[in-house]
Amino acid sequence: IETMKKLYILTVLILLTGFGTAFAQTLKGHIYDANTNEPLVGAAVTYKLHGNQGVVSDINGAYEIKLPEGGVDLVFSYVGYEDVLMPMVIGRRDVITKDVYMKESTKLLEEVVVSAGRFEQKLSNVTVSMDLVKASDIARQAPTDITSTLRTLPGVDIVDKQPSMRGGSGWTYGVGARSQILVDGMSTLNPKTGEINWNTVPLENIEQVEVIKGASSVLYGSSALNGIINIRTARPGLTPKTRFSAYVGVYGDAENDEYQWSDKSFWKDGKYSVKPILRGSLLSGIRNPIYEGFDLSHSLRIGHFDVSGSINLFTDEGYRQQGYNKRFRMGGNLTYHQPDMGMKILNYGLNVDFLTNQYGDFFIWRSPTEVYKPSPFTNMGREENNFHIDPFINYVNPENGTSHKIKGRFYHSADNIVRPSSGASITDILGNMGTNAQTIQNIAGGDYSSLYPALVGIGSGLINGNLEDAMNGVFTSLGNIFPNATTADYCDLISWVMDNGLPGDLGSIQNGQLPSDLIPWLSNVMNPSRNDSKTKTDKSYNYYLDYQFNKKWDGGAQITTGMTYEHVRYDSSIMDEIYKSDNVAAFFQYDQRFWDRLSVSAGVRAEYYRVDNHYREAETKILGTKVPFRPVFRAGLNYQLADYSFIRASIGQGYRNPSINEKYLRKDIGGVGIYPNLDIKPEKGYNAELGFKQGYKIGNFQGFVDVAGFYTEYKDMVEFQFGLFNNADYSMINSISDAIRMLMDGKGFGIGAQFHNV
């Protein structure tokens, strides 16, 4: 028995020794980009022996792999690069050093995107319609902001600064974008309004833009109702890089002389709202409106740090009156790559951005013959300053196929509405309306008797309690005083009255008397002592935290899951109130790759949302039971029919929560009011599509054809209604008669907009 034990132990030792020497051979080295010589982090080195065996490169691009004695076929692969096949013959206990240089793939469908699934994958494998724009494509267009480039994409449009995909946006000016806009995966939408200010996008430091068309709320939440636009910024390489550009443009005269709103002396007289730096020197000889811009960016690596920064200065006098824009943007990134992590990858850092911005909002034209002049009801511009700091940490463990990502944000914004112009004076308005020079001179001299008939016309009807007679009386009187008045002129007059107010003693008209304070009121408005061009400053604060976990298996399966929390505080100086909102969401997505041809994806999201004490903003019915959160789903597949031929199908749900401005805010914007409506419900919808993509190459010319058929349905879309509103309860006034009755009762009303579901 003892002899048997010795033989058994000896056999085990021999086997263990043989097993150890079988994989005692080592291949090591670095993996580089063949063009830039930069190390490729996370590149895979694999071979087949009883299944796939392999390792990945570390933060320095280094790899080390144990190989069996004899010959193997090694494959070096990296997303977005061409595979390198390396036959290798290695002797017992050999240690071989071999550096590998990989070429970036020049095939369009091999390009890498992250937006479709929150992880890197080939463009050809995504299950949704997606466009990709590289930095070189943007540079060739030399845009002043990214909207000029986005307009060139099929199915994408920018209507009054709002993004629209496949016609999916209604017309909610200044609030509630229905497409989510991201910079490096972080939303750039204003927390309180839900709108996009394109000046926040760092045009000077873009690597690529990824555009997904169709509902994408499962991974990106509210506002991804139409899709998403993800701007990915460039990161430093081994070689320091500095980029500077300067540009200038000149607007031509309007083709129709009636449309011309400026003349050749505007710049000298200081009538433009903003002044470009070169206007008073190099460009002083140009008489037409101009724009200019300067971009500067620099990036480099210092030890284990990635450092980048950029500055942008842009000034645009505007081809439309009140269409000006002036911005100064400064931002940067600092990333630290933790050394001595072996094959694991750990990096952390922060992004910082600051923007100060002045711009005009051209909302409604004054008249069909004055299309470049704004309506007096929309005499508004904005001054805005915002700052955000975004810390992050990323950890990747290729050994077990897991990754953890944490992103945060602190955001602060201060903005106010300004009046770019003081508006027409009462004498100018009367002159345009055809009032004779003597009447205007009398009014300017303090004789207001010519205006009495209009007020008496109202009173004659009110004495008898007949509002229709009152209106007929006033229109008859006004027709005599203003023989040449157009609708636009009356709008000027109404806007002027809204700005300067009315006599306080209007109730005396019902007794057939003129207001006792008519003369002091007229004297004050003819010689105004105030010119407050700004409203009070509103402030908003945003706190955001996002955690994402990803797990990959060798069989081609992977999951992406995580949670998001966002808190918004909005201090409204106009309402003298503070609004607070909280948003909590959890998401899960499963992706599987079969036979290296079929990609399948499915995901779900649940989101809770509240504003102040409105705790059930996301309330939904599930099987007849109300729950305080909203679930959404998506699914898709992509199948490779042949080389560079792909067919895809997908279906997804989307939603958009009304912004604080849409639902809760009362605000005056250039004479026009925004009125709250607590009955607004969230928008929701879904998108289903079937698509086919075919790549081609003819000589050095390559591209692809992408055809998609889709069906989109939306419910409870939010649109605004324009009209007269009761300033007390915010209800809409249905007739002029009701408005006059309110005035006679000493109650105020306003002109403005209110949002409703349609």
Sequence positions of predicted segments:
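Structural signature of Gram-negative outer-membrane beta-barrels, strongest in the C-terminal barrel
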Residues: 552-568, 572-713
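Short, acidic, small-residue-rich periplasmic hinge/interaction motif at the N-terminus
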Residues: 32-36, 43-48, 77-82, 91-139
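Outer-membrane beta-barrel translocator/receptor signature
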Residues: 190-192, 205-207, 218-229, 235-330, ...
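Short acidic/polar hinge/loop motifs at secondary-structure boundaries
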Residues: 64-66, 186-213, 234
